Amino acid sequence: MPKEKNDVCLTLENVSKVFARVESDEVTHALQDVSVTMKSGEFVSLVGPSGCGKSTILRLVAGLIPPTLGRAAVNGEEIDGPSPERGLVFQNPTLFPWLTVEKNISFSLDVRGAKAGKAERVECMLSMIGLERFRNDYPAQLSGGMAQRVALVRTLINEQEILLLDEPLGALDEFTRMNMQDEILNIWAQRKQLALMVTHSIDEAVYMGTRVLVMESNPGRIVADIKIDEDFPRDRSSASFVEYRNEILNRLHFGGKKD
């Protein structure tokens, strides 16, 4: 069974990130003066054009890169590197092709030598994504949606406090993508951790997020923090859903464009 979670407070305080260009003396201002606070139980969607710093924020929170200026902290403690309490799921499943579904899911536990309750935790993850009868299959035998579910629970088995999702559904077809949106929301609702997701889809951001952070580029910055005050599951055709969608479009200077 999942362990009881402590409340988490993630803060970015006046964070800027600058990348030097190898081929010239110029620099890229990926983020400039970003300040935001997120807490347990929130599902925060990051949306904006390519190059606005969405994935940079995830990498900062994951501890893969440090800020150039400012501070990133969890419960007041500065992030100074990766932690099993902050799990990152990428767009592509990146499963180990030589391991079965079951072995892929248990991989991080095996590496850490975490034997206590291992079998129960793996069984819980398989049940959560409905793949019990595929436990002995290999990644090449799975559909795209099945592989992404395995990648998701391979991260979740560490029972982290913060779940980071970097366009986790971008490579899937539309039908599988919608099913996976519900899968992720169901898991998030059970675990009650903080989830932070990067997406290029405004509909996905509104459908899944309790908050949507809208970003612009040059330099990367947050220009709007929109609370989505709707119960789950959400109706994509409802007037309120369309209103939220149009508000985000307006923030991104696409007001007046309607599908």
Predicted regions and their residues:
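The feature captures the beta-strand-to-loop junction immediately N-terminal to the Walker
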Residues: V47-P49
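Conserved ABC transporter NBD signature motif
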Residues: G70-P82
